[in-house]
């Protein structure tokens, strides 16, 4: 009870940052606070054919199960106070990752390429799946405004990832999904895909 009360007062946060030049996006940070307030910032080209590097920012509300899982895994990882890197040789680089726990006094961060600690692996996968959802939202917003013919292929990819449990916090993309689903100027198959994805959002 005391720990929960202290957490509620300080509203700590957990952040995940990835820096991976040449990937899409090449940089992003997700921050989730104990009260559920979350932010996502990324930088990189919109897609594989885009040459321009753009910044993207979105605020969203993390679902209670996700934020509880994030803080539970953070506690299991000792709030990142130790060395998270596996130090295994001959591992391909998958980007520099940094996890940060900030309780309002002194942030604690640890960086790694690959960790063999299960809580860290699970946090990494969860944050990467959240980034996938938010990057879909980014592209869908752009295509809806400027390139509606690209919506079908993008939503099909999104469906496939959702079916394979490769997306997290789908509700963060709900505004644009509902906008597409409710727009009679969009072809029916695209509207149906968007509607189907909104139906996957946990209530």
Predicted regions located by residue number:
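Short, well-ordered, aromatic-rich surface patches in folded extracellular/luminal domains
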Residues: 4-22, 83-203
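Mature extracytoplasmic or organellar-lumen-exposed domains after removal of signal/transit peptides
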Residues: 13-18, 42-43, 59, 75, ...
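N-terminal targeting signals for Sec/Tat export/insertion, comprising classic cleavable signal peptides
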Residues: 17-42
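A short, structured loop/turn motif at beta-sheet edges
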Residues: 35, 61-69, 101-107
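A short, surface-exposed interaction/processing loop segment used at functional sites
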Residues: 38-52, 128-140
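Acidic/histidine-rich, surface-exposed loop or edge segments in extracytoplasmic proteins
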Residues: 40-58, 157-160, 174-178
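A short, exposed loop/beta-hairpin motif centered on an aromatic-Gly-Thr core
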Residues: 56-61, 110-112
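Charged, amphipathic alpha-helical segments
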Residues: 64-88
